[in-house]
């Protein structure tokens, strides 16, 4: 859907639903007994010195609902400054709609466990990342100069575990990127910074950090390197 309610203002909306059958994903951790280990060895798996395993499976069906809203406004001031502003909003929610029964071989091997447990069902296959994202971008140009800003808000998200007591919810976060350009003939000189407020994700709790091996969630929508500043030179033919 595209609307132009005012001069220089454009609004677009995209609503979608995506259904996936037999989605490929990793199974939960399956505890292996001696029968299962011998079966793996007899089918080409090398020396096995572990007690659990995961494998890729088509055990689930998923459904994703979402909406993308974008509004863009353009304006030129009397002094020659041109302004371009874009506001965007995204909502995205995924859920598991069906989990297939275990294959017979697992029962035969005595590995009759939940192939897709709570962690995979709600988290890895569901809402591991924020459901809500809001962005505001502004570009100002005047003569050879241009100023760019992009402000993004990521909504909260939850890292799910097999046991609900170990779940961890991460708060919403704002990030700001800034850049300035100067154009001279075919040359463009840029100075900028990403995440200029030096925002870091919240640290994982003791359970999710795997004994301290991981400080931050690998599903954070933004990185854990803090602020990043740069300069670049471009030449346009």
Model-derived regions, located:
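Outer-membrane beta-barrel proteins
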Residues: 57-62, 166-170, 220
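C-terminal beta-signal and adjacent terminal beta-strands/loops
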Residues: 93, 150-160, 181-237
């Amino acid at each position: 859907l595209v609307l132009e309610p005012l001069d220089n203002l454009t609004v677009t909306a995209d609503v979608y639903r995506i259904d996936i059958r037999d989605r490929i994903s990793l199974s939960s951790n399956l505890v292996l007994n001696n029968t299962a280990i011998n079966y793996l060895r007899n089918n080409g798996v090398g020396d096995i010195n572990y007690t659990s395993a995961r494998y890729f499976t088509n055990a689930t069906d998923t459904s994703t609902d979402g909406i993308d809203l974008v509004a863009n406004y353009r304006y030129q001031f009397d002094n020659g400054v041109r302004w371009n502003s874009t506001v965007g909003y995204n909502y995205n929610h995924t859920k598991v709609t069906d989990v297939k029964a275990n294959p017979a071989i697992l029962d035969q091997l005595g590995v009759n466990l939940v192939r897709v447990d709570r962690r995979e069902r709600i988290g890895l296959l569901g809402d591991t990342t924020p459901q809500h994202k809001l962005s505001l971008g502004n570009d100002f140009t005047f003569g050879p100069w241009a100023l760019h800003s992009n402000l993004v808000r990521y909504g909260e998200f939850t890292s799910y575990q097999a046991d609900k007591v170990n779940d961890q919810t991460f708060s919403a976060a704002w990030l700001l990127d800034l850049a300035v350009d100067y154009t001279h003939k075919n040359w463009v000189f840029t100075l900028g910074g990403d995440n200029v407020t030096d925002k870091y994700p919240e640290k994982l709790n003791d359970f999710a950090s795997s004994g301290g091996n991981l400080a931050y969630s690998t599903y954070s929508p933004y990185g854990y390197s803090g602020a990043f500043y740069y300069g670049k030179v471009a030449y346009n033919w």
